[in-house]
C-alpha cells in the first residue's frame, strides 16, 4: 500500500494501488503551504545599492514581486520537505471564537439547512444534492491513478450525473443508496487511520448529516494523500535540494534588486569586526591592500552570531529565511541549556563538596531546573522568579540528601547565598552566564571548523558536562543547518566577499575558501 502500513489505493483492474500512486490534486495542494516572504522586497526599493551590487537600483514591478514571492514560496516548501522529516500538512482549523470561524460555521450551516429543506419538500428538490455528488465524484476520481480501471469506470457509472438528473425529474433519485456507495468506495481507498471515520459514516442515519460528514472525511483523505506524496518525493528533493534551492534563489535575485541587502550587511558587520580586531592587535602594522582575514572564518563567525540573534526584533539574512524557525528554536533551547549549566556550576562550587558522589541528586537537580525553565524564551516568562524557585528547590533537595546520609544540612546563610547567586543569573552582564556562553560558542565554533572527513565530535568544554548530551544533539543540528547553507549559498557569499573585501580588484582566490559542494 502507498501509506506505510496503510491501505492500498486502487490501481488498474485491481482493488489496490502500487507504491508509485500519484494524485493530480494532491500535488497541486502543496502550493498552499504558507511561508515567510519578508525582507526580499519590502525595503529594497527604498535603499541605495548595497556594496555587493555595482548596478544602480531599478524600480520593482508588481509582477517581479509576485514572481519572486512564488520562487521563494517554492524554495521554502522544498527546503522544509527535505530537512524536516516530520513535515506534513495538518487540518487548518480556525479558532473557535474567531470572526472567520463563526462566519464559516454560519454559512455552512445555512447551506446544509437549505439542503435538508429541499430533500424534505414535496416533491423533493435534488439540485443541490446533485451538485454535491458531482463534486464527490471528482474527488474520488482524483484519488485514482491515471488511466482506465474498473473502479474508475464504476464510479463514473454509479455517479452518472446526467442519469441522476433524469431520475430527479421523476423524483426517483436514491440519495441514500448513492451515499452508501460513496462511503463504501471511500472505505476501499482510505488510509487505515480513517477506518473509524468510515464506521461512523456508516452508522449515520440522517442523510444530510451523512453528506456533511462525507465531505469532512474526504478532506482528511486528501490531506492523507498529500502527505503520502510528500513522503515519497522527499528523497528526490533531498538529492537535488542544493541545486534546486540555489537556482530558485538566483531567480529571486534576478526578479528583485538588492535582494541580498540583509545578507550583505550581516557579512559586512563580521568583516568590519575582524578588521578592527586586527588593527587592535597590530596598530602600527603597515596597511595591506589585500585583507589577511579568511572569508571562511568570517562566515563561521556570522553563523555563530545567529546563536545570539534577537529573532523578535531583527530580520534574518535572506539566505537563512528557510531555516529561520529551526534556528530560533535551536537558540531558545541553547539558552535554556546555558542557564541549566550556570545553575549546575554554581551548585557545584558552593555545595559540591557535600554532594559529591550523589549522581542521582545531580540528575534530579537538572530535571528541576529544566522544568522550571521551560518556556523561558517567552516574553511573559519571569526568569528571576524561576531562578529563585530553582534555588529554593535546590536547597531543599540538597538538605534532603544530606539528611539521608546523616550529615548536617545547609545553614541559612549558605542557602540565602545560593538562592541569591541563582537569581543574579538574570542580570545582563553576569560573569557566570558570560563564561558559559563563551564556552558554548567555543564548542559550536569547533563544530563548524571540523574537517569534513572527521567523524568524531570535539570535546565539550569544562563546566558543560551536565548538558553534554543535549548540547551534542543541538550542535549536530546546528552544524547540519550551517553546512547545508554553505553548500547552497556559497557562491553568493563568495561574490559578496569579493566586492566587500577587494572592491575593484578582480580576485578569484576567495572561491577556494568557500566550499560550494
Curated annotation (Swiss-Prot):
It holds the Pfam family Tcp11. Coiled coil: none annotated. The modification Phosphoserine is found at residue 16. Transmembrane segments: none annotated. Residues 17-55 have a biased composition (Low complexity). GO terms for cellular component: cytoplasm; cytoskeleton. Residues 1-59 are annotated as: Disordered. Keywords: Cytoplasm, Cytoskeleton, Phosphoprotein. The keyword Cytoplasm applies. GO terms for biological process: muscle cell migration; signal transduction. InterPro entries: Tcp11 (IPR008862). Its main location: cytoplasm. It is found in: Cytoplasm, Cytoskeleton. Promotes the migration of muscle-derived satellite cells (MDSCs) during differentiation throught interaction with FMNL2 and therefore may participate in microfilament assembly. Interacts with FMNL2; this interaction promotes muscle-derived satellite cell (MDSC) migration and differentiation. Belongs to the TCP11 family. This is T-complex protein 11-like protein 2. It comes from Rattus norvegicus. The gene is Tcp11l2.
